[in-house]
């Protein structure tokens, strides 16, 4: 039968092993989130540029505004 000190050491080693596995898992999650955030930033920049183009394209001079055909 292991002594109290040996039992504590085994318990600590077991906890350390679980913590190391958890740190590795969390690191993987963070890396995946970083990739997702980078992809979303690119998409937002693209959408912002497209929106800007639409806004600039829809702003014209009042002379360009023609009355609807039913007038």
Curated annotation (Swiss-Prot):
Domain of life: Bacteria
Coiled coil (residue ranges): none
InterPro entries for the chain: SlyX
Pfam families: SlyX
Stated family: Belongs to the SlyX family.
UniProt-listed PANTHER family: PROTEIN SLYX (PTHR36508:SF1)
Protein name per the record: Protein SlyX homolog
Gene that encodes the chain: slyX
